[in-house]
Amino acid sequence: MLALICGQGALPTRIVKNCYMRPLIVSLTQFQPDELVPDINFRLETLGTLLDLLNQREVTTVCFAGGIRRPDINSTLIDEFTQPLAASISEAMAKGDDGALRVMIEIFEQAGFDVIGADDIVPDLLPSVGVLTKRLPTLQDQTDATRGHAIIAGVSNLDVGQACAIANGQVLAMEAYGGTDWMLNSLTERVGSWPLGGVLFKAPKIAQDRRFDLPCIGPETCQKVKEAGLSGIVIAHAGVLVLDVADVIAEADRLDLFIWVCEVPL
């Protein structure tokens, strides 16, 4: 049986719709998924109890999907089943996002569960290489994409973010704790401070475990890119999830944006 460990956003719903049998829906109490009613809510302080419940439900496979911000840990709420995991949880919370997620995956694997990625369930979340839209990237857009890849690769070991905005070779913004939406919103507030144009570049971190926390885009990403004054979106092939690809392409075409799925390194 599959358990879907859900965060916020549309990805968990997309996965459930693609499953021939409904998975067990599990959610962190602080981060509820869109349009889904969890079968189990839990806190990190009760993670050990969750692992026991999953075994009781005969769960064998786990998939993590959706957005999660790092929650605060209240040591007084750690229950007896979670006490043996307390040191590992504390270690995870002290790391960057990628490091924290690696520790969490290890906890589930050591408990006997197979951990799979969202694209193992929904392969078409990863579109093929090429330009998906009517609009094509210019030579400058391609140069900016190359610059974007170099930047994301360069900061990967710092475990910072998975996206940046580049225009005419200049870094307009970098993704950090607030995520891509926050980054794009910060550009929207400053539109007019530079010539319009540029790209949103998204890619996973170098050596990232791709079963967890792959970057993603959806129709709303296109809207925010347009509002930020950028010309299009460049994503790394097999490294960025595209929710409802037909809707994303239609929205990009409507807004006269390009979407380019490229092999990296460029």
Predicted feature locations:
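Short coil/turn connectors at secondary-structure junctions
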Residues: M1, Y20-P23, L36, R57-T60, ...
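Long amphipathic alpha-helical segments
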Residues: R43-G48, T61-I78, F108
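Hydrophobic alpha-helical segments and helix pairs
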Residues: I78-L139
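General beta-strand structural signal in soluble alpha/beta enzymes
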Residues: L4-C6, I25-S27, V62-A65, M93, ...
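A short acidic, amphipathic alpha-helical/loop segment
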Residues: T13-N18, C63, K224, D247-V248
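N-terminal basic/disordered segments at the start of proteins
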Residues: M1-L28, E45
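Conserved mixed alpha/beta catalytic, RNA-binding, or beta-rich assembly cores of soluble enzyme
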Residues: I5, L11-P12, D98, A118-Q223
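Feature captures the catalytic cores and cofactor-binding loops of soluble hydro-lyases/lyases
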Residues: L28-R57, T76-A92, G96, W182-L266
